[in-house]
């Protein structure tokens, strides 16, 4: 036992090469050469058979044989690099005096460049028995010198011999095995080894099996030939001896990619992670050829066409010793992670062929967690194993790998169905079949870290929904001595349960959002959005300190309007019965003479009244939140109604409010609603307020004219001017700001005392549609315009991205004034606004010469918004133009989005916009921002182009000129090539017509956006309207001329090809009810099949004749016959990607369709004249 490295029961001996990275031992081995020669370490494992056991030597074969071509199939590229590994074998087993080297050439496909040992990447074959030697046990250490070996250290290149690298595996079946507990300590690394014994009933004479025994002094030293593995793609890579690697050497098989990986050594500094726990051990075949199978993720895994041998997947107890291999792709945490799962174990090749009689499926564990679904106990029995436990000396060499194999193997008579543990939830997960020898387990090195703690008898906490992992189940099944399992050790080693559902890849997985997007263009009528854009409600917890009502205190009889001893709130619905008001928007009308009793409850049953005056808990869906901010809703004096006037206007009334909060900035918290009783205007009712001694008392006066105006007079002892004059901070109190427009008061109105507080009026946020709403929002107020034109003549209209629009009444004529949102200080900003003003002066200004104006009118100037004047004030620029009462085309389309506009109006819209563009282009100008929001509608329904903010004069001389309009309507050449031509406006107009005709929402990005700019209009559907059906829809009595047979059919066809439309339009299908007599069905012929073809054809022809008789004779042909598709063809030309392929405005206006519509129409573009237009003049 002392001299033989390994001895079985029969007495046969064989040497097992072991790794030795000790520099001291290296000097002993390489003393003759005076250089450090690293020795490669391997385990030559033998199997014990019950009947007879004999050792088979691993014979060497030349790599240049047909077998190599069988494996590689000549499919590997020559760019794959060769890894040259050399093994030194000592002939003398006692003193390790002699050393022989075996050079092995192995190709590695990935272009790795690694400077250290690849975590015991033992991708080399096992040595023959004749070349092996043993080393003293004391020489084996765990130290690994990074500089102990190099390619240049080999002095005898002739001693290097090639060894076989590829062979066929024939795995053996072992049905039962036992587990002997083992200890893995970091101090002395004492390992208890287990023996695997095969059942006598299943002998296989083809190969013998031996028990693995590693004696105390039976360690051979094999060092790696090179620590610097040059794996870069270099065709000139040379071997150690200086020779070039032959091109035909490609010793990697596609069928050998997936094999259990178990490193032999983890002593390298690079290998921070431990080797795998489980290593598959497969018996050698008759040829005893050394084999390895390297997992790889880049090499194609398709089966070799010339493969004739069948491979069985190695089981956890019958895998080949050659399976103790590591791929360069499986590096530690400090290694190279060139792939997504570079730190994971090997994947299983799909090219592996299983034996038909023993079908197996490989189940692997990836990562650091293992999920075991259930344990299975086979029906057959197993023979007890003959245990052989030997204690090698203290070392942490490759012996620990065997310990990991034996100590963590599954227990006997149990099989675990292990899931493929992938990180990504998108990968397939397949369960393995129940077979005792079909498990190949790959695990990371962290399992070994806590391996010594897995035999504890203490219960290990696991999630109740997760079963035990394989290694834990095995150790729990045992009853052995070991260290105590601690939670910290378990957490440091590896997660002991499958926690993939809690991993980031599962927690943050989201569906592909584009899958929920529309596959095409969205119809406007398919979007159901609320018509009113409401403001968010106020925070309910923000209470006004001055408006809190105390319902527990009795109101003193300060006013005759209150009953004595009554609570302020009275009944829940009686709060306003105490408030005499002239003009209040309450849920029910309140009689000022009504007393406080329960009879008034029914007057306020429509809403729940808040106990806090100034807030409303109920919101009306038909009005905005602004209208519901308070029940104390006061209208302007112009909206007073006689029935709402108080019967006793001369009587002073007081309403009591209690507030327990001192009106002091140091006490009252800083809330947005803090200053609620600040100056404002326009109230026509009195709201008397009573407060305690700490809070101010608000009194109310009556003007001399007898009309009650709410005025707040605070007690001068408790209130100060500073508290009232401070500006508010929320929209509710914006009307109380300093800039509120109020008439100046004279001294008589203020009172004789100059220190008295001015009586002010209160207005609680009038609605946006009220005439005086300008005074509510400071952003909608312009002091300069008010001073210039008067407050009554200025009205806020709306705002855009860069400007605010006002309506101005000047000399009894309305104008529109556009003001910049912000003061323009920068040079570029001023140039932009000046360029717009210049364009307006050139294009739309009214000339002094009347003849010139008339000529320009005929050329299309009338379809542009007229320019009046422009000026600046305090860096704000004002542009005064013509006012269009009809709003914008965008608003018009929104109002009519629920049905399709008739084609005649579409042609009218196209003609009017083209006339305006023709005039713009004739002046060598480009609009570049044409969209419905910039097209205005006059009172007569005509269209006018406005907003020349991006208008540019041609030619463009600026090198860095870059102007882009709305991305929904922008032409593609403006983005890609910066080509500014008049055809860019034609493209924008084509998209406007497409939007109107198809009733769609133009996309602003994505695939539909790109398709529209590539000439693909397939998503839009048909653009030409079915004017016949629309004509019949708007003429409900015309169906009386239809025969009864046609009406009984319930559906029919117009007879024209495509004249009935298709399902892509909203106006092609109308239900027909023979009983109602006011509607008609015009369905496509496909939907009209209800009987025999002859009957349907007869009914369709009769219906077609009757319908054609209803069409007026003067109707344009292109509107009657739906197969003409004139509008579709025109839009396709306008939206061509090449700008020079598009027609000009003049060319489109010269089309016959445009000429016919222009001659027939009598109204503006937005006025409906019928599906076929107005009849011609007699």
Swiss-Prot record:
The keyword Disulfide bond does not apply. Pfam families: Pkinase. SMART domains: S_TKc (SM00220). Phosphorylated. Transmembrane segments: none annotated. GO terms for biological process: cell morphogenesis; filamentous growth of a unicellular organism; negative regulation of G2/M transition of mitotic cell cycle; negative regulation of G2/MI transition of meiotic cell cycle; single-species biofilm formation. GO terms for cellular component: cellular bud neck; cytoplasm; nucleus. ATP binds at residues 797-805, 818. Signal peptide: none annotated. Mg(2+) binds at residues 934, 947. Belongs to the protein kinase superfamily. Ser/Thr protein kinase family. WEE1 subfamily. Protein kinase that acts as a negative regulator of entry into mitosis (G2 to M transition) by phosphorylating and inhibiting the mitosis-promoting cyclin B-bound CDC28 at 'Tyr-18'. SWE1-mediated inhibition of CDC28 acts in a cell size or morphogenesis checkpoint to delay mitosis in response to defects in growth, actin organization or bud formation. Plays an important role in filamentous growth. This is Mitosis inhibitor protein kinase SWE1. It comes from Candida albicans (strain SC5314 / ATCC MYA-2876).
